[in-house]
Amino acid sequence: DTWKLRLLIRRWYTFLNMQKKVVPQLDNLVTVSRASRQDIATDFDIAETKLDIVHNGIDTRVFRPIPAIERDEFNVMATASADAPLKGLDYLIRAISILAGEIPELKLTVLGKLKEDGKTAKLVSQLGLENRIHFYSGLSSQEVAELYAKATCAVVPSIYEGFGLPAGEAMACGVPVISTNGGALPEVVGDAGITVPTRDHLALADAIRTLLADSNLRHTLAAKGRSRILELFSWEVAAGEMVQLYREVVSREVAR
């Protein structure tokens, strides 16, 4: 595994060095969020004004509420690569550990593959949460939407997200969301979810506790989340933004 990791790191830096040579030569650049625009401008030493934003699209026909599926009470859901540090899953697991003594029925459903003998597996075992945390991988988008339909709430514990598809997909499914303020997540969630600081398992536990105890708040956030995605982040909206950008670029070129 060590040599594979080194190879991946080498490839990443080769790609990054290539990008740093190419980017300054481009007249028009597009990224998916204000947070990404700021980071790219800083890392590549270019003006933010050179970067346009077209948000990622979410398929709201697949990721949608499914009333026919009954929600499981006290079922928290997360999408996170188990051993990817930036996804912050370890903080959520520690939050679940805190709440386990208060809520006997509490369980965590994770969309992600658990690596045997990985850090996450060891943490789950160390905290005695093997029967509370269930990992799923290799699912279709429809199967993911069906899992969301069973969830009481969704949590995005990421330390950084360039956009935040997990939050957007959960919101599109009508699931109330708790997310960190990492990267672009506040742009996606807005006021349609509960936002907490990154790397703070105590804040995550407090937010989960609050949401599980308040059905009115869950219903309010679920409705606001679905509406926000339809208004700002559907594929129809993303396509329209991209078409408009193409028109602006063509107009600028013609005017030269």
Residue ranges and their predicted role:
Residues 8-29:
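Membrane-proximal helix-turn-helix segments that form the acceptor-binding/catalytic region
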Residues 138, 146-151:
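Short alpha-helical donor nucleotide-sugar binding micro-motif in glycosyltransferases
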Residues 120-142:
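Nucleotide-activated donor-binding/catalytic signature segment of Leloir-type glycosyltransferases, i.e.
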Residues 194-201, 210-215:
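Conserved acidic donor-binding segment of nucleotide-sugar-dependent glycosyltransferases
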Residues 159:
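Aromatic "clamp/platform" in nucleotide-sugar-dependent glycosyltransferases that forms part
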Residues 35, 57:
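Carbohydrate-associated surface elements
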Residues 176-179:
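Short hydrophobic beta-strand element within catalytic cores of glycosyltransferases
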Residues 69-87, 93-96:
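Conserved donor-binding/catalytic core segment of Leloir-type glycosyltransferases
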